[in-house]
Amino acid sequence: MYGLVIEGVRFMIQENWGPQVLLQVQKLTSLSEKSVSTHDQYSEHVVPQMFKAIHEITGTPYEQIGVLAGRFFVQFLIRNGYGDLMNVMGRRFSDFIKGLDNIHEYFRFSYPKLRAPSFYCKSESEDGLILHYRSRRTGYLSYVIGQLVELARVFYQLDIGIQVLKKKEKGRFTFVVLKISFDNVGLGQDLKLKERVKNLNEYLPVDTKSFLQMFPFHIAFNKKLEILMAGQGLLNLMPNIQGLLMTDVFDLQRPCIKFTAEGIMVHQNCVFQIESLHPVVKQTEENITVQINDITEDKVSLEKKTVMDNEYESLPYVTLRGPITVLKSSETFLLLATCVVDTLDTMFKMGLYLNDFGESDCNREIIMATIQKSDTLKTMLENEKRRSEVLTEMTREISEAKKTARTLLTQMMPYEVAQTMMRSGSVDHCEAFECVSIGFIRVCDFSKISLFIEAFEVVNLLNTIYSHLDSIVDTHGVYKVETIGESYMISAGCPYRDDYDAEMVSDCCLEMVSHIKSFEYQSHDAVKKVLIKCGIFTGPVVGGVVGVRTPRYCLFGDTVNTASRMESSNQTPMTIQIGQRTKDRVEKQASGAFRIKPKGNVFVKGKGDMRVYEIEKKKGRARYKKSDPLRKKMVAEKKEAEELLDEDNEGHRSSALSRMSLGESIDSSSSRRGSLSGSQLELNKTIAQTIELTSKASAALDLNMQDENNRPPTWSASHSQDIRKPRKTESKITLNSRLSSSDLAVSRVETSKDSDGETPRPTSSELKEVNRIREEALAQEKEEERTTKEENQKIEEVGEDHVSEATSLLDSEVSHGDNNISFSQMPSDSIPHEDRTSLPSATPSEIGDAISKKKLEKEDSNSSMSSLDERTTVSAKPTTTRRLLNQKDLEKEKKRSSMAGSSVTSSSAHSHSIRSKKDTRDKSRCKCEDIRADNKLKTKVCSIM
């Protein structure tokens, strides 16, 4: 697997969870110490391990991680310049799926050892198609589904549905049948095209000579796969293939089916690729060997000799690629292939020349373009490759040195403390422990032994003894603190707290004494037997790291001094002396399992007389587990990581697996497709949920793609427009749309573009201002609704009741500034001066009309702006009500002649005041309609308002 896929997963983690999660995933997958190169190959287990690490860190379901990684990989390819290629691979989504293998072949130019999966389609209809997915890897189904969903959404604006009809994993191989549902609108056009081609066949006959010239590498074979005819270009390379079986000469590489006539009939829409089973090399008659017959010396034979520069060089194989057409009239299969070559050196070894290709074959141009490459560029690439190899070797050496340093650091101090130091780079560590058992072990009469042996023998003796003691310490799970000369210090309960600290140290010392009894030093005759003595004490201590150049983990406290005194005051070799605290704690933890003998009082320096005891032996087994779980877990994780890193990657080698074996394994275990099983239904349900959950993250990534800082330089503005075509379900943002701030951010893709053709991005302050204006508009709408409702209610009451009630409205009190003026009690000369000029000296109806108009103008001047749409709605209902009111006034005028004039006049005055209100609103309305008309002002609403 190439690093391009790993980089895509890292891109997904960075965009979706952030750099902290990415660092944690890299540490769990052993990728933190080296950079990933897109053109280097890595183990197939890296990506599944990354998915597993993401699941453990974030708790996201595994299937959802796979779908999300597939969707983000499409965006990653777009950012790296592959978007233009994928944008032109198919006019319709069905065409794109049919050409997936062609995309992989294109990538093979940059990634020559690519082991791509195989895709081919069946049962295409107007509602979708059936896709067969075959791969040499397992665990990538959700990853592929995510890619298909994102490709359809980004490039074709389609929301597709995917259902797993069949899934099988056999060894390292995966065979899946997917049903992809979408609106396949182009299928009818394809059927019409086939009908046109069928009609053209009657008018465009092709003679055999022209056909052979167009396809010099064609192969014709029958249903038994017998080769009937081959092109001249192929016969120049493989002259004796006619009459042989296709399966005896070639290996079917694509598609992943069994090489049979039935399989070819079913997969006619696929591009086939076959490769010769045996290498093809050029033969020449320049070197002639003469072989003399044993019977007659007259007869000689000439033998062609194969010319090869180096027998260890890679041998060339003939690779043919093209469609297979079925000739129904003769029941013959025709492979219209072209020969695929990589380099000129391969052509020379095979004996292939440019004129062997057809005149319309594009391989000529590709090969000529290869020849024209600059020699300087080749030299630079070779030098860069050598530098890269040197850098890789240096990186490997640095990694080994770091690994060794970590190992030494974890041996010098506790594992957790060492990890903290490696992460932070600081040596500041101090921790208090309430109850710790400390043990000291000393070699007896060491000064006398040193007199009889040389200095290097002394070192060798101590090293041998301490090595035996180290193995015992690891067994009981206690911690070796340090060695000072002939003294050996251990502890339990620190740095790892334990409820059986005293029992652990006591058991360890008993085993040490027992082991030393049977120990014999063979290197020197003067020292055969070695004796030790032990001292144990329990109490509180403080542990921490001291030193900078050579940091050490040390224990401090009175307990350490007392434990040392327990050992030094012990005068009996091969015994274990303990204090009162240790005795009480051992009896509590072991429940009388130890046989402890009192030794009376012993004078201890700095302590005076202390009661001491001697541990003789123990009966029964230990209540704790005799192992160091943390250290064993660390070793297991380290071993597992090293196995994953050192595992041989089969992708580094050229693929030699026959695709026929894949097809045979499929056919041998295939069964009829019936109803979906429960596991498949559950899988389809999970897939649908994960697609829906990952859609939001993918849409958010589209917004980031529109940012010019994130957009790659090769991504043109026109391509960005194609990518972001609005879907049918989307609508443009209006000023009075009730959207939250997050909805506004997601809908920015629908905002209009400026004169330069680029999408303007509103700032955060502008978005806040738009939200504020929207809230004010909503509040104003509610106020307008309330006012309109009150006015309509008053008008309806006037229409239903007696007309005289409408006249009484003129006598109502009207709020005017700080004073309440009643016109029924005040003469016209008592009206304020600012209002008197607007009142004519006319009939009371005209006076009421003017007063109502003045009142409405005051109300409108104090009210804020509202939306145009709501004003239009408000003005509709009073108009209808006014018409009903006028009709009722005319009817009542006939009945009451005395009151008709004043009533109708007052009613019409009130109606005229409403019209005046409408006119005033129309004049003072906001510019919302103009804002909608001018797209540039949509993000500048705050300045307009």
From Swiss-Prot:
Polar residues compositional bias, start-end: 711-720, 732-744, 817-828, 862-884
Pfam families named in the record: Guanylate_cyc, HNOB, HNOBA
Tissue: Expressed in BAG sensory neuron.
MF (Gene Ontology): carbon monoxide sensor activity; GTP binding; guanylate cyclase activity; heme binding; metal ion binding; nitric oxide binding; oxygen sensor activity
Activity control mechanisms: May be regulated by molecular oxygen. Probably not activated by nitric oxide (NO).
Statement: the UniProt record of this protein carries the keyword Cell cycle: no
Entry GO CC: guanylate cyclase complex, soluble
Manner of cofactor binding, per the entry note: Binds 1 or 2 heme groups per heterodimer.
Protein keywords: cGMP biosynthesis, Coiled coil, Cytoplasm, GTP-binding, Heme, Iron, Lyase, Metal-binding, Nucleotide-binding
Domain Guanylate cyclase: 437-567
Cofactor dependency: heme
Enzyme nomenclature, EC number: 4.6.1.2
InterPro entries referenced in this protein's UniProt entry, alphabetically: A/G_cyclase, A/G_cyclase_CS, H-NOX_domain_sf, Heme_NO-bd, HNOB_dom_associated, HNOB_dom_associated_sf, NO_sig/Golgi_transp_ligand-bd, Nucleotide_cyclase
Location relative to the cell: Cytoplasm
Catalysed reactions, as listed in the record: GTP = 3',5'-cyclic GMP + diphosphate
Chain intervals with Basic and acidic residues compositional bias: 721-731, 750-759, 766-804, 851-861, 886-896, 916-930
Biased composition (Low complexity): 661-679, 898-911
Residue runs in coiled coils: 388-413, 763-802
Chief location bin: cytoplasm
Family: Belongs to the adenylyl cyclase class-4/guanylyl cyclase family.
Primary role: Synthesizes cyclic GMP (cGMP) from GTP. May be involved in sensitivity to quinine by regulating egl-4 activity through the production of cGMP.
Subunit details: Heterodimer; with other soluble guanylate cyclases.
General remark: There are two types of guanylate cyclases: soluble forms and membrane-associated receptor forms.
Protein name: Soluble guanylate cyclase gcy-33
